[in-house]
Amino acid sequence: TLSVSSAASDVYKRQEVQRYVSRVLESLDTTQLQDAVLRLYTYRDKIKQKIKQLSEAYAAEAFQKQININKIQLQEHWQMKNRIVPGQTHHTIIQKSLYAKEGKMNDLEAEMIMSIASLPNVLFWHRNLERNKGFYINGFLNHYPDFIIVTKYGNVILLEVKGGHLTNEDSKAKIRLGNKWASLAGQRFKYFMVFRNHAIEGAYNFEAAKNLIRNL
């Protein structure tokens, strides 16, 4: 039998998941059913992925509806901690970091934040922590941006760094959420998803983002 893991059932009631799987199986012809038996785990993974997509689409739509009727509002209450305990720290110190040691970064992240930190208007930056330790945008998904940057003029920038291979649906969803957060948070708050060269819609390449940050 084809079954869906408890992770999917956490999103939908088990009966709804079972009904969806039944509809999928009923839509298959004899040849496809035989193929499903031979490639059981492939079909299972495809069904799980589809359920995840439907769940995320429903959550995004419901989230937008709640915003439209003023049921969701932003409040400025999150604060930087006096000290942090990253799981792993970055191996080098980059100027203007908020803490003596910041969390681990990959080469692209380190390259970008080092360049941004060199801008004269940047007051400090912080490598945001994940897994309930750092700041996250609480929307139709929980999004932990890579960096928090504060300028000398009081502007707060959330920066999400992406490699060229990460132009997927998850990136697009984070752009929608990040831009919505920035529009609701007020003029001082910005969200940039940044690619080294070729950005997807709603994001920026690095030079464009850096030029914007230079003027904030």
What are these regions (language model features)?
Residues 3-143, 150-155, 162-216:
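Intrinsically disordered, low-complexity, repeat-rich regions
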